C-alpha cells in the first residue's frame, strides 16, 4: 500500500487540507486524517493537490500527434500524453475533413477500443463536423463544412458503433432532422460552429440539441442587423436552464469575467471544462495548424 500525506484533497464537497490518502490494489481505500498506525510506503505531498482523474469530452490530439493521424502509435501517444496531465478518460474528437479521412478515423477508433493499452481511457467518439457553418468554421477546414446529410451520417454510424456525441450547426440541420435521428439512437447532439441567432438556437435547444460546443467560440452573441441589436445564439444558451455548455477555460480562449458570468447563470452542474487540445499541445511548437 501507498500512503500520501499532507495532501490537499479535492472531493465533491470541496478541498480538505492536510489529509491522508491510502492506495492499495489500484484502489483508494482511505481518505481522511493521517493514520500513523498503518504500515505503508509514505509519500509526503507537502501541500500539493490530490484529485480524481479528469474527464475530457473534447480533445483532438497532443504531444505532436492527432487522433486523425490514422495510426495506432499516434493514437496511443495522444492518450498517454493526456493521462500524464491527469486526464484518465477522454472522448477522441474528429476534425472536419474529407469523408474518407473521417472513415479512417472511425475505423481506427474501433480498433483501439479493444487495445489493452488505451481501451479503459476511451469514452466514445465525439464527431466535430462536418455539418458546420462555413462562416463559423474557426480553426476547422471550411472546405469540408457541409449541410446535414442523414444518409452520410448513417455511414459514420456503420463505421463506428461508439459515436456518443456529434457537434452540428443547427442552421445546417433543416427541420433538425439529424438531431432527432441521433437522439433516437442515444447520441448527444451539440450545437457549435454556428452562425445562427437567438430564434434558431432556441428552437434547436427545444428540438434535441442538449449540449453546446466550446461556448462563445465560433458563435454569435448580440448582433447588429440594420442598425438594431438582435439576440444571438449565446443569449439563447444563457437563457436555457437545461443545456450543458463546454468552456475552454485555459485563460486564453475566455477571460475570467466571462467564465464567472456563465457560472452565475448556468451553475456548476451545467458547465463542462474541456481542453479542445490539438497536436501542438505539450510541444514547443510556435505555430501549428489544426489537422496538420
Q: Where are the language model's segments positioned?
A:
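Divalent metal-dependent hydrolysis catalytic cores, especially in the metallo-beta-lactamase
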Residues: 60, 76-105, 120-133, 160-171, ...
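Active-site loop-to-helix "anion-binding N-cap" substructures in soluble metabolic enzymes
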Residues: 64-69, 92-101, 171, 218-230, ...
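Active-site-adjacent C-terminal substructures of enzyme catalytic domains
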Residues: 200-292
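Histidine-rich, glycine-flanked metal-binding segment
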Residues: 1-3, 9-51
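Active-site glycine- and acidic-residue-rich loops that bind
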Residues: 99-104, 171-173, 186-198, 248-264, ...
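Residue-level marker for buried hydrophobic side chains located in beta-strands
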Residues: 53-55, 190, 273-274
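Divalent metal-binding pocket/active-site signature
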Residues: 127, 135-231
Amino acid at each position: 500500500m501507498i500512503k500520501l500525506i499532507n495532501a490537499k484533497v479535492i472531493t465533491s464537497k470541496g478541498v480538505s487540507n492536510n489529509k491522508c490518502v491510502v492506495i492499495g490494489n489500484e484502489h483508494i481505500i482511505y481518505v481522511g486524517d493521517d493514520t500513523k498506525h498503518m504500515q505503508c510506503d509514505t509519500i509526503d505531498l507537502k501541500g500539493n493537490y490530490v484529485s480524481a482523474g479528469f474527464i475530457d469530452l473534447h480533445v483532438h490530439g497532443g504531444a505532436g500527434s492527432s487522433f486523425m493521424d490514422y495510426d495506432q502509435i499516434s493514437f496511443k501517444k495522444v492518450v498517454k500524453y493526456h493521462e500524464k496531465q491527469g486526464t484518465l478518460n477522454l472522448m477522441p474528437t474528429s476534425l472536419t475533413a474529407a469523408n474518407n479521412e473521417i472513415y479512417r478515423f472511425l475505423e481506427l477508433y474501433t480498433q483501439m477500443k479493444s487495445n489493452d493499452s488505451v481501451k479503459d481511457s476511451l469514452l466514445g467518439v465525439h464527431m466535430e463536423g462536418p455539418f458546420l457553418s462555413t462562416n463559423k468554421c474557426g480553426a476547422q477546414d471550411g472546405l469540408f463544412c457541409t449541410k446535414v446529410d442523414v444518409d452520410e451520417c448513417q455511414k459514420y454510424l456503420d463505421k463506428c458503433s461508439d459515436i456518443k456525441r456529434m457537434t452540428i450547426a443547427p442552421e445546417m440541420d433543416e427541420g433538425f432532422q439529424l438531431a432527432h435521428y441521433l437522439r433516437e439512437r442515444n447520441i448527444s447532439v451539440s450545437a457549435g460552429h454556428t452562425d445562427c441567432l437567438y430564434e434558431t438556437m432556441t428552437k434547436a435547444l427545444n428540438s434535441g440539441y442538449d449540449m453546446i460546443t466550446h461556448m462563445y467560440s465560433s458563435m454569435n452573441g448580440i448582433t447588429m442587423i440594420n442598425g438594431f441589436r438582435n439576440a444571438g445564439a449565446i443569449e439563447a444558451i444563457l437563457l436555457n436552464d437545461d443545456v450543458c455548455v463546454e468552456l475552454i477555460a485555459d485563460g486564453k480562449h475566455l477571460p475570467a469575467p466571462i467564465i464567472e458570468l456563465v457560472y452565475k447563470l448556468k451553475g456548476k452542474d451545467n458547465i463542462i471544462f474541456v481542453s479542445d487540445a490539438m497536436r501542438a499541445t505539450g510541444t514547443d511548437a510556435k505555430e501549428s495548424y489544426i489537422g496538420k
